[in-house]
């Protein structure tokens, strides 16, 4: 990527220059770059809108250049930085539709997607993803499912999650064609796929077919937590300025320059370093894991049931043949100095990036080799996802009057929140 920018510097360079000048800071934030726990350069770079640092709400300088670089890298019509993660992107996409629209989405959508529908007072129509019974794992929505649903009842938009937490990817292009044929926009929560444009060995994202999509750069690239980007597709009928205006409504008016700077840097790192060396490392790592007794890495043989491709940098390890469940494997790995992204009943999930030191992979192999053995085979049950009968809108359910009742008395009642059990944090050591 050509870094000879119109304004002659990047966000990190501008912030570094300002910190080196060490002016008397009579502006926000209150720590003034001085005595804060993390100290040093990081505190010095935490500034506000100043001469030379641009303004995220209406960028015309270095932020605009950064957004333009993302636009070009992702093949979008317009790209906008997000400092509230893909949650703020989903809120923006939902509200940009207007209010009271009909939206078709998968039952496995992220909770922030449900919040977005509630806040916009949209009518949600849920579809069940395909189920892979052999893996005990939910697959993805299919073009046929979407078409049948739109034939039954029109919708203003289809909201698709792809890739999912396991790195599985839906037929986004096929679903886009169906949605557009029935007059619906296609919105994609691609939070876990920010890195896809940087290697031909990663799933191809059909940017030309999608209307709006968001990516969580912080999940898989070298950016700070909460750093994300919202993209407007080249053929989206919606005015990008409308999208930006809505983005400004749901995002703080005091955006973190540390987050924006990390977004700028993350794109530079991805384009300069590339992913080829990492793809080679991951191929070798997956082979090493596959040679460990009782372990199996999800691969191309796990596709189908709506999944047409997968992100091989998302290493999903099935531990059931070892006679243990995912939680036992997770906790054992923690004790070996390895912390996974998450686990479920049968697997542990690891997010790998080019920033991983090679030594971590050796430590992982050692931890996996020393996983305990269970006394019996773990049998997989297909996930049960019930649609139920909708009796009110998401907004009425989530924002209406509520009361807390015992679980035994909840039959026939409407849930105000979604409750689930998921192991995504480091367990307390004994």
Which residue ranges define each predicted feature?
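N-terminal "arm"/small-domain region of PLP-dependent enzymes with the aminotransferase-like
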Residues: 1-61
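Conserved PLP-enzyme active-site core in the AAT-like
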Residues: 7, 11-16, 37, 73-76, ...
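Conserved N-terminal alpha-helix of the aminotransferase class I/II PLP-enzyme fold
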Residues: 42-85, 108
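A short linear hydrophobic-aromatic micro-motif
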Residues: 78-80, 337-341
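Conserved PLP-binding catalytic core of the aspartate aminotransferase-like
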Residues: 277-336, 347-366, 370-372, 384-411
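Conserved short beta-strand edge segments in small beta-sheet-based binding/regulatory domains
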Residues: 374-381
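Short acidic, Pro/Gly- and aromatic-enriched capping/linker segments at domain boundaries
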Residues: 409-422
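Residue-level detector of conserved catalytic or cofactor/ligand-binding positions
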Residues: 422-430
């Amino acid at each position: 990527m050509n870094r000879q920018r119109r304004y002659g510097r990047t966000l990190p360079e501008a912030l570094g220059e300002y910190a080196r000048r060490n002016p008397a800071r009579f502006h926000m934030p209150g720590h003034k770059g001085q005595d804060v726990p993390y100290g040093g350069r990081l505190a010095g770079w935490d500034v506000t809108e100043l001469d030379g640092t641009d303004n995220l709400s209406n960028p015309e300088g270095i932020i605009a250049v950064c957004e333009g670089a993302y636009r070009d890298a992702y093949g979008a019509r317009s790209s906008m930085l997000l400092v509230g993660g893909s949650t703020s992107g989903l809120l923006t996409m939902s509200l940009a539709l207007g209010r009271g629209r009909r939206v078709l989405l998968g039952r496995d959508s992220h909770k922030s997607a449900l919040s977005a529908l509630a806040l916009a007072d949209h009518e949600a129509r849920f579809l069940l993803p395909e189920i892979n019974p052999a893996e005990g794992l939910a697959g993805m929505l299919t073009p046929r499912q979407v078409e049948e649903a739109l034939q039954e009842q029109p919708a203003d938009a289809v909201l698709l999650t792809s890739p999912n937490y396991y790195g599985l990817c839906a037929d986004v292009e096929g679903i886009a064609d169906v949605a557009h044929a029935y007059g619906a926009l296609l919105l994609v929560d691609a939070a876990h796929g920010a890195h896809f444009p940087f290697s031909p060995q990663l799933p191809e994202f059909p940017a030309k077919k999608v209307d709006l999509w968001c990516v969580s750069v912080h999940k898989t690239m070298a950016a700070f937590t909460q750093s994300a980007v919202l993209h407007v597709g080249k053929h989206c009928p919606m005015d990008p300025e409308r999208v930006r205006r809505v983005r400004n409504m749901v995002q703080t008016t005091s955006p973190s320059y540390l987050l924006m700077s990390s977004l700028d840097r993350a794109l530079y790192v991805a384009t300069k370093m590339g992913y080829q060396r990492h793809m080679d490392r991951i191929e070798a790592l997956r082979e090493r894991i596959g040679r460990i007794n009782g372990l199996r890495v999800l691969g191309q043989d796990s596709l189908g049931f709506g999944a047409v491709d997968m992100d091989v940098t998302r290493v999903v390890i099935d531990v059931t043949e070892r006679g243990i469940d995912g939680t036992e494997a997770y906790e054992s790995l923690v004790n070996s100095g390895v912390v996974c992204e998450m686990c479920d009943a049968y697997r542990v999930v690891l997010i790998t990036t080019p920033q991983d030191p090679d030594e971590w992979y050796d430590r992982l192999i050692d931890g996996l080799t020393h996983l305990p053995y269970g006394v019996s085979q773990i049998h997989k049950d297909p996930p049960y996802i019930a649609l139920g009968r909708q009796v009110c809108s998401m907004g009425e359910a989530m924002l209406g009057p509520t009361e807390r009742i015992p679980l035994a008395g909840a039959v026939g009642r409407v849930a105000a929140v979604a409750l689930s059990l998921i192991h995504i944090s480091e367990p307390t050591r004994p």
